[in-house]
C-alpha cells in the first residue's frame, strides 16, 4: 500500500496544506509538517472529526463516495489541440436488510394498487361503452319507428289520389316499401335532413387528425371504438350537436357520413308555458316568462292597439290578453302574500273593554272649530295659529266629568279636503260645526258628504249663538235641505247650540257625544298589539321623523316595531299631545312617536309587528310597488298625451320646490297647486318634502330654474348662503291662502294675453278723386271718434267688411295730419286699395293686449 504524506493528502482532497494541518491538529493528530506520513486510521479519525464539524452523525460506513478524473484531447480545425478534463463523483449507499425489505414491500403494494386501478378503469370503460351502445340502439329504433309512422301517414294521405299513384308507380317502376329495411346497409345515402342536422359525429377509419385523447398513452391506439371482437368500429353520436366541432379542426364539419350515421331532428312542437302574473309587470319581464324576445311582445301589443316600450309597466288584464294571444296559459299570483301572512299572524284576541270615542270636529273655515276645542281643553290653540286658521290635523284627548274623549281638529279650508276625508275615516263620531250667523257653506256640505261616505254618525254644534245676527232656525232649515234632520223635527241627529266664548251649551254637547258613543258600544282589546292610523307626520331637526298616531286597538309601547305604510321602525320615544314622555298608549289615545325611518303618509294605517325582519321586508316590498305604480302612471300619461300634444303650443311651466312642516300640509299644498293647471300653464312640483330647506333643495332649484316655497319652515345657513349667492327666488309662507294667491298671480302672468280690437273712429266717404302722387283719394267726413294715420283700418260697404289694411295718407286740406276729430273733413288714401266708392265707411281700430287671469 502506498504511503501518503500530508502534502499528497492535501492534493487529493484539494485543500491547502496549512488548512489541512490545522484540521489535523484540531482532530488530535500528531502531524505538524507536510512531509509527515498519514496512516489509514489517522485518515478515518480526521474524516470523523470533519463530519462532526459539519453536523453529520452516526456511522456512515455504509456510504462511499468515488471520484474519477479523465483527461482527453480535443483537436480543432486549426490543428490546435485542447486538453479536456472531466471529473465525475458518485456516492454509493449500502442499505441494510430491513430497509431493503421495506422498499420491496412498498413497491409490491404500489404495483397491486396500479393493477386494481387499471381493472376498475377497464370495467368503467366497458360499462360506458355498453350504455352508449344501448342509447344509440334506442335512438335508432325510435327514428325507425318515426319513419314508419311518417310513411304510413303519407300512404294514407295519398290513398284518395289513385290515378296519380298509379301514374307515379308506372313512371318509377316500383314504389318504395313502407316498412323500414331490415339491413341498415340497404340505404347507401343519408337523407338530406340528417345531413343538415349534423346530429351525428363519425370518427373516420384510419383518418389521422388532431383528435383529443384522455391520456397520452392512448396516442398509439387505433382511433374509434374497439368492440369485444377487437374489430374497429366508428363512433356514432346523436346527442351532441357540436361533438364533431370539438373533436376535429374548425371548418371540417362537412365530412362524409358513415353507414352507421343516424338522422335526428329537433322536436317542432311549441312549448306552452304557464305564466305567473302579478298585479303589474314590465314588458321585459313578461317576455322573459314566456321565453320570447321583448320585441315579439311589443309587436303583439301594437297589433292589439296598445303602444308599449320594453320597460313599460302593464297591468294584469293587459298582460293576460298578451299571454293568451301568444298561446300560453296564465296563473295569477298574489303579490301581497307575505304582507297578508304577517298581518294574519298577529293575534288581536283578548278581553274587550269599553273605550273612549274618537270625535272629529269638521266644518267650514272660521266657523269656530278650534275655538270650541280650546274651551273644552281650556287652552289657546287658535290664537297661536297662523292667520287664525288650522292647517293640519290636531289630536287631543280630554278628561271630562262624563268620561274621556279624544278629539281630532281638521282644517276647514277648501285646500284641506283630503285631511277632512282622513279625519272622517279615523273617527267614531263627527261634530259638524256650523256658525249660527253664517249658515251652511261649501265646506260644511263637504264635511257632511265625508261623514256619510265613512258611515260615521254626526252631532251638529251650532256655534256663535251669542253673536248678533245668529239665526238657529235658518241654520236648521239649510241643514235639512242637505238631509241633516234634527231630532225635534223627526230626524236622528242631535243639534246643540254652543258658544265658545261664554261656554254656553258645551256640557250639553259633551253629553250628546257620550250618549252617541254609548249607542255605538265602542270596545277595544288593550292586551293586543297596537294598530291605528297615522294622523300626521313631520321631519324634526334633531329628532328625525315624528309621526302622530291614533291608537284604535291594543296598546302601543316603547320599543315596539311599527309598520306604517312605506315606513317602519322601532319606537324610540312616546310623547303625548303636551310633549310629555310616556311609556305606553292605550286605545283612543293620540300619541307622537320617534323612530320611523321616514315620514309616512297621513291617513296610512299602522300596525305593531313582532318580527323586525318581516316588517322591513314588507316595507321594502311596498316601496317597490309604489315606485312601479308611479312609474307606470307617468309612462301611461306620456304615451296617452303623445299624439294629443302634437300641434299644440308649448305649455309654460312654473317649477316649484316645496317644503312644509308636516306631511298633511304638504299634501294639501301639492293638490292646491296642481289643481291650477290649465292647457297653457301648469305648476310642476320638482321636489317636495317635510323639513327645513337644505342646500340640496337650493341646488335642485337652481338646476331646474324653480322657485322655493317654504311653508312654516326655514332654510339652514348653508342653504341661505347658496341662495343669496345664486340669487334663487325663495319665499316663506305661514298661511296657505298666500301661497295659492301668489302662484295664481304668477301663472296669470305666464298666460298669453287676449287680443281685443278697440275702434277709434269712423269716417264716411263723401267723394272720390284721384291724386297723381297717391292715386285714389277718398274725401271723408269723420262721423264718430277720431281717425288716426298710423293705425289699421277696415273698409265697410253696406256694413260688410270688404278690405282690411292701413292708411297711406291722411290730409286736411293740403296739410298732412296725424289725426282728424269728429265732425271734420279729411282726405284718406288707402294703401294698396283703389276700389273706394261713395257711401263706404272707413273704420279705424287698434289691437290691444288684455292680461288674462286664471
Curated annotation (Swiss-Prot):
Ranges of biased composition (kind: Basic and acidic residues): 128-150, 211-232
Binding locations of GTP: 363-370, 409-413
Keyword annotations: Cytoplasm, GTP-binding, Initiation factor, Nucleotide-binding, Protein biosynthesis
Gene3D superfamilies found in the cross-reference section: P-loop containing nucleotide triphosphate hydrolases, Putative DNA-binding domain, N-terminal subdomain of bacterial translation initiation factor IF2, Translation factors, Translation initiation factor IF- 2, domain 3
One Pfam family it belongs to: GTP_EFTU
InterPro entries in the record: DNA-bd_dom_put_sf, EF-G-like_DII, IF2_assoc_dom_bac, IF2_II, IF2_N, P-loop_NTPase, Small_GTP-bd, T_Tr_GTP-bd_dom
Keyword Ligase: no
UniProt feature, compositional bias: Polar residues: 61-75
Domain tr-type G: 354-523
Main location class: cytoplasm
G4: annotated span: 463-466
Cellular compartments per GO CC: cytosol
GO molecular function: GTP binding; GTPase activity; translation initiation factor activity
Subcellular location per the Swiss-Prot or TrEMBL entry: Cytoplasm
Residue ranges with Basic residues bias: 247-257
Family indicated by similarity: Belongs to the TRAFAC class translation factor GTPase superfamily. Classic translation factor GTPase family. IF-2 subfamily.
Protein name from the UniProt record: Translation initiation factor IF-2
Organism: Marinomonas sp. (strain MWYL1)
Gene: infB
Amino acid at each position: 500500500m502506498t504511503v501518503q504524506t500530508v502534502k499528497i493528502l492535501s492534493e487529493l482532497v484539494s485543500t491547502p496544506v496549512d488548512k489541512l494541518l490545522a484540521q489535523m491538529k484540531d482532530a488530535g493528530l500528531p502531524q505538524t509538517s507536510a512531509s509527515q506520513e498519514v496512516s489509514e486510521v489517522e485518515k478515518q479519525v480526521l474524516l470523523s472529526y470533519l463530519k462532526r464539524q459539519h453536523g453529520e452523525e452516526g456511522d456512515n460506513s455504509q456510504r462511499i463516495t468515488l471520484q474519477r478524473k479523465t483527461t482527453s484531447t480535443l483537436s480543432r480545425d486549426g490543428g490546435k489541440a485542447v486538453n479536456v478534463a472531466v471529473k465525475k463523483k458518485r456516492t454509493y449507499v449500502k442499505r441494510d436488510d430491513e430497509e431493503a425489505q421495506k422498499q420491496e414491500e412498498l413497491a409490491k403494494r404500489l404495483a397491486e394498487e396500479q393493477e386494481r386501478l387499471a381493472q376498475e378503469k377497464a370495467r368503467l370503460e366497458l360499462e360506458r361503452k355498453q350504455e352508449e351502445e344501448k342509447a344509440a340502439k334506442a335512438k335508432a329504433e325510435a327514428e325507425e319507428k318515426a319513419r314508419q309512422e311518417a310513411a304510413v301517414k303519407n300512404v294514407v294521405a295519398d290513398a284518395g289520389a289513385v290515378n296519380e299513384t298509379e301514374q307515379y308507380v308506372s313512371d318509377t317502376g316500383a314504389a318504395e316499401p313502407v316498412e323500414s329495411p331490415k339491413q341498415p346497409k340497404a340505404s347507401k345515402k343519408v337523407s338530406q335532413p340528417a345531413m343538415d342536422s349534423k346530429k351525428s359525429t363519425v370518427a373516420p377509419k384510419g383518418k389521422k387528425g388532431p383528435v383529443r385523447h384522455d391520456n397520452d398513452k392512448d396516442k398509439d391506439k387505433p382511433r374509434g371504438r374497439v368492440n369485444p371482437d377487437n374489430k374497429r368500429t366508428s363512433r356514432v353520436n346523436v346527442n351532441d350537436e357540436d361533438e364533431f366541432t370539438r373533436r376535429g379542426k374548425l371548418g371540417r364539419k362537412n365530412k362524409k357520413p358513415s353507414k352507421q350515421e343516424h338522422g335526428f331532428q329537433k322536436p317542432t312542437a311549441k312549448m306552452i308555458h304557464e305564466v305567473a302574473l302579478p298585479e303589474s309587470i314590465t314588458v321585459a319581464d313578461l317576455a322573459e316568462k314566456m321565453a320570447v324576445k321583448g320585441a315579439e311582445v311589443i309587436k303583439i301589443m301594437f297589433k292589439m292597439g296598445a303602444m308599449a316600450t320594453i320597460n313599460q309597466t302593464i297591468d294584469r288584464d293587459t298582460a293576460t290578453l298578451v299571454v293568451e294571444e301568444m298561446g300560453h296559459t296564465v296563473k295569477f299570483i298574489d303579490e301581497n302574500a307575505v304582507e297578508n301572512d304577517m298581518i294574519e299572524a298577529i293575534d288581536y284576541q283578548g278581553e274587550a273593554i269599553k273605550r273612549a270615542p274618537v270625535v272629529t270636529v269638521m266644518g267650514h273655515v272660521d266657523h269656530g272649530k278650534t275655538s270650541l276645542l280650546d274651551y273644552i281643553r281650556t287652552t289657546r290653540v287658535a290664537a297661536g295659529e297662523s292667520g287664525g286658521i288650522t292647517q293640519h290635523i290636531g289630536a287631543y284627548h280630554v278628561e271630562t266629568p262624563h268620561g274621556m274623549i279624544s278629539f281630532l281638529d281638521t282644517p276647514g279650508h277648501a285646500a284641506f279636503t283630503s285631511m277632512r276625508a282622513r279625519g272622517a275615516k279615523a273617527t267614531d263620531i263627527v261634530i259638524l260645526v256650523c256658525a249660527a250667523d253664517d249658515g251652511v257653506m261649501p265646506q260644511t256640505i263637504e264635511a257632511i258628504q265625508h261623514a256619510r261616505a265613512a258611515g260615521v254618525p254626526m252631532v251638529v254644534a251650532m256655534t256663535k249663538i251669542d253673536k248678533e245676527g245668529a239665526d238657529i232656525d235658518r241654520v236648521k232649515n239649510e241643514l235639512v235641505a242637505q238631509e241633516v234632520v234634527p231630532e225635534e223635527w223627526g230626524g236622528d241627529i242631535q243639534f246643540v247650540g254652543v258658544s265658545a266664548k261664554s261656554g254656553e251649551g258645551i256640557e250639553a254637547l259633551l253629553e250628546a257625544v257620550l250618549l252617541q258613543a254609548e249607542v255605538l258600544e265602542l270596545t277595544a282589546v288593550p292586551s293586543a298589539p297596537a294598530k291605528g292610523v297615522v294622523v300626521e307626520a313631520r321631519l324634526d331637526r334633531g329628532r328625525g321623523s315624528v309621526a302622530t298616531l291614533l291608537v284604535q286597538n291594543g296598546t302601543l309601547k316603547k320599543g315596539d316595531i311599527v309598520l306604517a305604510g312605506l315606513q317602519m321602525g322601532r319606537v324610540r320615544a312616546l310623547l303625548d299631545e303636551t310633549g310629555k314622555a310616556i311609556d305606553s298608549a292605550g286605545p283612543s289615545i293620540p300619541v307622537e312617536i320617534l323612530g320611523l325611518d321616514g315620514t309616512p303618509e297621513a291617513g296610512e294605517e299602522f300596525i305593531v309587528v313582532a318580527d323586525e325582519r318581516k316588517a322591513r321586508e314588507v316595507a321594502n316590498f311596498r316601496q317597490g310597488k309604489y315606485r312601479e305604480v308611479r312609474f307606470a302612471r307617468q309612462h301611461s300619461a306620456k304615451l296617452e298625451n303623445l299624439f294629443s300634444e302634437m300641434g299644440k303650443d308649448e305649455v309654460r311651466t312654473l317649477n316649484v320646490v316645496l317644503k312644509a312642516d308636516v306631511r298633511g300640509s304638504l299634501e294639501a299644498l301639492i293638490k292646491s297647486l296642481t289643481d291650477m293647471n290649465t292647457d297653457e300653464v301648469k305648476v310642476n312640483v320638482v321636489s317636495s318634502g317635510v323639513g327645513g330647506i337644505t342646500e340640496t333643495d337650493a341646488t335642485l332649484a337652481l338646476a331646474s330654474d324653480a322657485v322655493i316655497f317654504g311653508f312654516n319652515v326655514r332654510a339652514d345657513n348653508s342653504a341661505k348662503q347658496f341662495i343669496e349667492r345664486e340669487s334663487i327666488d325663495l319665499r316663506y309662507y305661514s298661511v296657505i291662502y298666500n301661497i295659492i294667491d301668489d302662484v295664481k298671480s304668477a301663472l296669470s302672468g305666464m298666460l298669453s294675453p287676449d287680443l281685443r280690437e278697440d275702434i277709434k273712429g269712423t269716417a264716411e266717404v263723401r267723394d272720390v278723386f284721384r291724386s297723381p302722387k297717391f292715386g285714389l283719394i277718398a274725401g271723408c267726413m269723420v262721423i264718430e271718434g277720431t281717425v288716426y294715420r298710423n293705425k289699421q283700418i277696415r273698409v265697410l260697404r253696406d256694413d260688410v267688411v270688404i278690405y282690411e289694411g292701413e292708411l297711406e295718407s291722411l290730409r286736411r286740406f293740403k296739410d298732412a295730419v296725424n289725426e282728424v276729430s269728429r265732425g271734420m273733413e279729411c282726405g284718406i288714401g288707402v294703401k294698396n286699395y283703389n276700389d273706394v266708392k261713395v257711401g263706404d265707411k272707413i273704420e279705424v281700430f287698434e289691437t290691444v293686449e288684455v292680461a288674462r287671469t286664471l
